[in-house]
Amino acid sequence: MTTLTSLQRSEAQRNHIVDLIDKACLRIAPIWPLDSFVAVNPYLGLIDQPFDTVGRYLEQTVGESLFMDHGWFADKIAQGEITDDDLAQAAQQLDPSISLDTIKQQLAVHRQPAPALPLVTNELDRRDAPPVSEFVIEQVSQFMANYYDRGQALWHLPKEASASLFAQWRRYTLINRSASAVGLKQVRQHLLAVPSDAIDALFWALDQINLPESRLPDYLFTLLKTIGGWASWCRYLHFQAGLHGESQHDLRDLLIIRLVWVALVIKETSSAGRQQWRAKLNDWFDPAKLVASPSATATASTKAQSSRIDEILLAAAEQAFRRRINAGLNRQPADAPDQQAERPTVQAAFCIDVRSEVFRRHLEASSPGLETIGFAGFFGLPIDYCRMGESEARLQNPVLINPAYRAQETGDPAIAQHRHARQSRGAIWKQFKLSAASCFTFVESAGLSYVPRLLADSLGWHRSSLPPDAPGLTPEERARLHPQLVKLDGGALSTQEKVDLAEKVLRGLGLTHTFAPIVLLAGHGSSTTNNPHRAGLDCGACAGQAGDVNARVAVQLLNEAAVRLGLIERGIAIPRDTRFVAALHDTTTDHIELLDLDQSGIESDQLSSLTQALKQAGELTRLERLVTLEAQVDTVDAEKQATFRGRDWSQVRPEWGLAGNAAFIAAPRWRTRGLDLGGRAFLHDYDWRHDKEFGVLNVIMTAPLIVANWINLQYYGSTVDNLHQGAGNKVLHNVVGGTVGVIEGNGGDLRVGLAMQSLHDGEQWRHEPLRLSAYIEAPIAEIDKIIAGHDMLNALINNRWMHILHIDDNGIPHRRHAHGDWRPEPI
């Protein structure tokens, strides 16, 4: 194997290397900031490869696991949850050559991690000094936190607007003398020789590292994963730029920074140390020497079989879960409970979020004349939201799409002035508390004034943290502000545009006939305190925001007389007595707040009946949830207990969020009505018989289903390997950059994913890491056509990152196997 130096490389060869860099960067999944924290598939850049192949690759490059330990599966087998039939069927589908005895023998073997790709920084780690490997990560992380600060820091890193991320880091490192503390005495002198241009610095670093080009992809990926949190942040910036047709190279610069650090460490390493590192590196790249099991004679085939057995165990657990669902789906319309032959009294639309499944089930049981609908929580409105008096808008639709319209906050301009004045005073007070001149005397001079608030927070008397739109406003002022639908440039929509949008909303909801007198559109949000990841509990379809804005805008649109008149021409006749009402479902307390009732026109007796049904459903839902959260549930005053959890600033588990999610069902509601799905299924109402051109099906499979998969795999990754794909211990979180993210403790890499407390109750896992099983009641040919026409969906299904199942007219699920082969599922 040969390597080329910078002087020997042609322009084409240089471009090829840069292309390898960019491809390595695309292997990293993005992470959204805390104020819009949405779930992301942490394996997004790897879905072009089969599931088990990625499992081996992650284990061998960075020591990351893609599967639960064997003990977890063994417990399920011992408890009878996973049967021998489940194991045998999974083996038959994935690798018929593997017998049941082989699986059980492997189950008894403790899985040994493969040696991760060796890094030169590890060769300098000594017991009598801080680890060089940790120092490098810490130095990069501190710089990145300063560079990307979003208003948290009072002392800012000086930077030039035109300078690149790499150029800023180089200047920062030249004046930072901390490397000497870990024995790197000559870093500054070596760094002076590094070119200030990022691409030139890249080739300087590669000359020092001196790796054959064939080994670069694995090496580059491994380096990025050592700073995976900040790499994910830069990938987010790259992703956002791509949505707007722009280019962004911070992630490339970050990888070059990491490569330069490797080169600097190589220059500080003794000749013997370099030789030792290169010997280990050569062994790692030699398949005959790479060992992933206790036996030194392990071969590539046995390692592949071990990984395949791990996937067989996972597939068997998923089969066991689906068995419980399959039996419930096997019904005819006449078999479903409480089928309405007449006009329903209320139709209530909720987000497909798994938490809504519990509330919908209890609401339907509380009011037999009521129907519920499942739909993505942004209600099909591609909008952003701009507060009055502000110029920047926030996203209120899925992060995969750009907004087409704007919800503009309107009301008395004086309210916006009051808000600005109060927030300005708050900012001044905060600066006074934290500034270098006053911070040391602040506690002595003003500390006693905080005693009442400390007591209120500690005893749960204080309200939960305010939603993003509430700071600076009184409740009365908030009630006087309303969102108004406008164009992105602020112009008014024509009636035709409103009718087009209203038609899309109604057809997406499946509401084109038989309207109830009251149609409730309920967005959802949460109410927690001292929780940096609060947005992760809000609506993912609304970009990590509460869905009340979308619900209010949709209601205004659908109650407008001119819009209803235009809908008649589209074949949708809304009765004159039908009124749409907006609501907000608080998933922490399971309280439903009805919004803008002064504009609803609902009769008092109708309102009273609806309020009573919502209250009763909330009580039953709270009791069901609190059993999994509290050792003792107050059945008399569960609402107070749930509210206290949201207000308690020491509470690390105010709610379980979407823990337990494992299924997605797109079918008519009668198919699932009355089924107890345990808050584990995303429920999207869909009837293919009313979807003539299957446009709604296409939207469901390429938007809500993808979002559900992202959520599912975020929870999966955070559970199977919280060190690499999770956020660690929530108690130790410190916010970085205002809204950028969190670190664990006082240093280290940016953490991604979910904290352990969101997945584990201290004794057992509350999330069962299973790949999503998506049930769709639609013709197989149409499902196959959509899969074939959507690259991401195709990769997710064909490479086994999720399961897709068709429900036939008899209620029998058929699962899609390799090469598009559909087979009936056991019931």
From Swiss-Prot:
Annotated GO CC locations: plasma membrane
InterPro entries: DabA
Cross-referenced Pfam families: DabA
Spans traversing the lipid bilayer: none
Entry GO MF terms: zinc ion binding
Keywords tagged on the record: Cell inner membrane, Cell membrane, Membrane, Metal-binding, Transport, Zinc
Chain residues that bind Zn(2+): 351, 353, 524, 539
Cofactor(s), by name: Zn(2+)
Disruption phenotype: Required for growth in ambient air.
Compartment(s) where it occurs, according to its Swiss-Prot or TrEMBL record: Cell inner membrane
Keyword Transmembrane helix found: no
Main location: membrane
Regulation affecting activity: Uptake of inorganic carbon by cells in the presence of thiosulphate is fully inhibited by the uncouplers carbonyl cyanide m-chlorophenyl hydrazone (CCCP), carbonyl cyanide p-trifluoromethoxyphenyl hydrazone (FCCP), S13 or SF6847. Not inhibited by the ATPase inhibitor N,N-dicyclohexylcarbodiimide (DCCD). Inorganic carbon uptake is inhibited by the ionophore CCCP, suggesting uptake is coupled to a cation gradient.
Topological category with respect to the lipid bilayer: Peripheral membrane protein
The protein's name in its UniProt record: Probable inorganic carbon transporter subunit DabA2
Source species: Halothiobacillus neapolitanus (strain ATCC 23641 / c2)
Gene that produces this protein: dabA2
